[in-house]
């Protein structure tokens, strides 16, 4: 394969990842199949970087003219519009399943139900409120830090979520599931590129903040995996969405705590 063909392949995989995780229209020549989607997992972090960057730009453009809370809300709205609430939906389904089911089979069945239950509604409401409050506090501390936090959290949280594919078992047998292609083994190349995207954005942060966030994310990933194994024996697309949302919130929390210490 020539260098030009290699670059074209990587661009194609990035666009496949962006088409899967966002509502941004893709060129007609971009075709996603199971193999491409599996390999495109290497670029899930970069998709988060794009979403976070656009959200941060909206925040930075409005924060001089609007109250911090409104600017943060607009930035969050941009993120939801770009992704279609894809990960938030996974969070709600996961909490409905984990909260309402007794056995792994019950939990998977409930998670498949498109209706929103009480556990999911509570999780979604609390997650959005937490993100808003943490970002407002970061904005009041320093608007530059708040915008950087959006970029970092959207990227790193997707790195944590997608890296679960590498070590864990996909537990759904439904061939029609949108996440079924992700059940294929994630190669070491996909994992390394994914990790590189997460580490790259840490350059937005000061040394102590970057190191603290990296260590917390490593521990959080392990904790999430333990919970998923105990609850359903592995992961599904919904639980990956939940992992992303949880990791994003923890990112904001860590950056706020470290910022106050500094």
Swiss-Prot record:
GO terms for biological process: cobalamin biosynthetic process. It catalyses: alpha-ribazole + adenosylcob(III)inamide-GDP = adenosylcob(III)alamin + GMP + H(+); alpha-ribazole 5'-phosphate + adenosylcob(III)inamide-GDP = adenosylcob(III)alamin 5'-phosphate + GMP + H(+). The chain crosses the membrane at residues 43-63, 66-86, 120-140, 146-166, 191-211, 242-262. GO terms for molecular function: adenosylcobinamide-GDP ribazoletransferase activity; cobalamin 5'-phosphate synthase activity. Coiled coil: none annotated. It is a multi-pass membrane protein. It is an enzyme of class 2 (transferase). Its cofactor is Mg(2+). Pathway: Cofactor biosynthesis; adenosylcobalamin biosynthesis; adenosylcobalamin from cob(II)yrinate a,c-diamide: step 7/7. Its main location: membrane. It comes from the Bacteria. GO terms for cellular component: plasma membrane. InterPro entries: CobS (IPR003805). Keywords: Cell inner membrane, Cell membrane, Cobalamin biosynthesis, Magnesium, Membrane, Transferase, Transmembrane, Transmembrane helix. It is found in: Cell inner membrane. Its EC number is 2.7.8.26. Joins adenosylcobinamide-GDP and alpha-ribazole to generate adenosylcobalamin (Ado-cobalamin). Also synthesizes adenosylcobalamin 5'-phosphate from adenosylcobinamide-GDP and alpha-ribazole 5'-phosphate. Belongs to the CobS family. This is Adenosylcobinamide-GDP ribazoletransferase. The lineage of its organism: Bacteria, Pseudomonadati, Pseudomonadota, Gammaproteobacteria, Alteromonadales. The gene is cobS.
């Amino acid at each position: 394969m020539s260098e030009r063909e290699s670059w074209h392949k990587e661009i194609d995989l990035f666009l496949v990842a962006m088409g899967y995780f966002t509502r941004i229209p893709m060129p007609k020549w971009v075709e996603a199949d199971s193999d491409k989607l599996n390999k495109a997992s290497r670029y899930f972090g970069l998709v988060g970087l794009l979403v976070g960057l656009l959200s941060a730009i909206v925040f930075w453009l409005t924060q001089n003219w609007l109250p911090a809370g409104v600017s943060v809300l607009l930035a969050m709205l941009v993120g939801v519009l770009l992704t279609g609430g894809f990960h938030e939906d996974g969070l709600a389904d996961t909490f409905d399943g984990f909260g309402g089911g007794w056995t792994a089979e019950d939990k998977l069945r409930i998670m498949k139900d498109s209706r929103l239950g009480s556990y999911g509604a509570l999780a979604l409401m609390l997650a959005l409120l937490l993100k808003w409050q943490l970002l407002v506090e970061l904005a009041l501390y320093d608007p530059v830090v708040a915008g950087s936090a959006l970029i970092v959290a959207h990227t790193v949280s997707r790195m944590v979520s997608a890296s679960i594919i590498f070590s864990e078992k996909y537990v759904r047998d439904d061939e029609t599931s949108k996440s079924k292609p992700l059940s294929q083994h994630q190669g070491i190349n996909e994992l390394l590129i994914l990790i590189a995207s997460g580490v790259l954005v840490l350059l937005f942060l000061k040394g102590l903040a970057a190191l603290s966030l990296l260590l917390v994310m490593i521990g959080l990933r392990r904790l999430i995996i333990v919970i998923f194994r105990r609850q359903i024996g592995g992961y599904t697309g919904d639980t990956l969405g939940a992992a992303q949302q949880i990791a994003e919130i923890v990112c904001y929390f860590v950056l706020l705590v470290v910022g106050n210490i500094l």
